[in-house]
């Protein structure tokens, strides 16, 4: 995959920036009024796709865009590789069986098998992979375990040798260059131009219409969880790593 994806990206560039191919598409596009509605729609979409991918740029800018696209393809690969490596590197090792309180037997057995496969027979190992992560967040009575898992997941590839922070910075810079080459003020404008929202402001407005009631509902749920915790003598303030656990109880 590491070798194939940049090659695939380059192949796409060679196709969408091929002058002869685009001329054929443009000829049909310029005479699209004679087509059936579905044919006209298909031609318009093809034409727009080619333009969005640099078909109208001059030769020098096409080469620059190709270089940016190849850079982005490699950065995306690095980003995903860092995520995978960071995921595989994370583990929570439990040595005391009392800390497994609340967990289903299937989860405990899986953790024991994972420990055995890592040469730690007699212990339990939990990982960031969903079958291991989710039951722990939902059912583990040990709050410290839940906190470890939650923070490990939400800071994945945040620092260390698998940090994606420098990769993200490079992606942002490359996307900015790509948008500028294609005549957009920023990458957000480039992306929204091709969808129903059309502008970044419209997209943000739509997201906020969803976000505000969603946040309000979460506050209600957390209040219910806090009331449950208080009623059962749990001397805590509900934190993010408590959410799934108490959601199972209220």
Q: Which ranges hold each PLM region?
A:
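Active-site-proximal, well-structured secondary-structure segments within enzyme catalytic domains
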Residues: 42, 74, 81, 86-127, ...
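N-terminal helix-rich structural modules
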Residues: 1-106, 110
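Short His/Asp/Glu-rich catalytic/ion-coordination signatures at enzyme active sites or charged loops
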Residues: 1-4, 25-67, 125-166, 170, ...
